[in-house]
């Protein structure tokens, strides 16, 4: 099958781009021919600016050559932020609607879709695009939330988030700790991902501060989109980590190998998100064999595995951290 993929792509520092690369590699391994349409800062086969819907028009123009067109959808990938970009947003939505109408083989993998704002023309057009496309989601709860937000019934298929995750780094906990120069026996908790308020890493720091015992909490991540909210949040997190004994913030982009090494080295990966649809970090942890402490938001509850722990409050998060610091081991890290 000949497949076009529309997505951000490495070397851009973007989790969805990394996901798209892994999923494209899987498709190629299955014998499909894959052509990636990426922004200029990605290593796609075709590179166009993701502005004003140009990526969708390019896919539509080339569409006759493909049996399937897969669009990786997350608003931040395709829409310029801010009120001054209103016309650009309309053009982007028009581009996507034109693509799905002209090329019915288009599939939209929805990583995230912000709640619909009915008064905005770009959202009206976007809703029409979704209505004509075949949609994919990672969890049933994401699909249901999408239907509530957009007030529409749409058939959809679910895809395992792990299909877009490839790990080839260190999986053994002891080896990962040696690689990172860490104490082999000290309790280690890790938060990993982009620094933004919805990740809730500040919740983990406060819960760690409220617990007792040996151990470290390491936050590994960087700001992906330099919005004022994200920049302010990173600054606050920096101050909070510096003021909390046992907490380290390793700010900056990390290679897949080092990212996976930190996850493998951890006794628990902590995902204290305040808003999420699904989590690539959780999928990576599951493939690496690291249990996670996961907030009950969005589709995460549906994504958790048998060794993961779901928390529904800050106090439950504190108690989960306390158990690890007290030496209690649950699951495969015994």
Regions found by a protein language model. Give the residues of each.
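Donor nucleotide-sugar binding/catalytic pocket of nucleotide-sugar-dependent glycosyltransferases
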Residues: 130-171
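A short helix/loop element that forms part of the nucleotide-sugar donor recognition site in Leloir-type
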Residues: 169-182, 235
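Conserved donor-binding/catalytic core segment of Leloir-type glycosyltransferases
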Residues: 182-199, 205-208, 217-220
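Glycosyltransferase donor-sugar binding loop
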Residues: 216-235, 252
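Acidic donor-binding loop of glycosyltransferase active sites
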Residues: 261-277, 290
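Conserved acidic donor-binding segment of nucleotide-sugar-dependent glycosyltransferases
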Residues: 306-316, 323-328
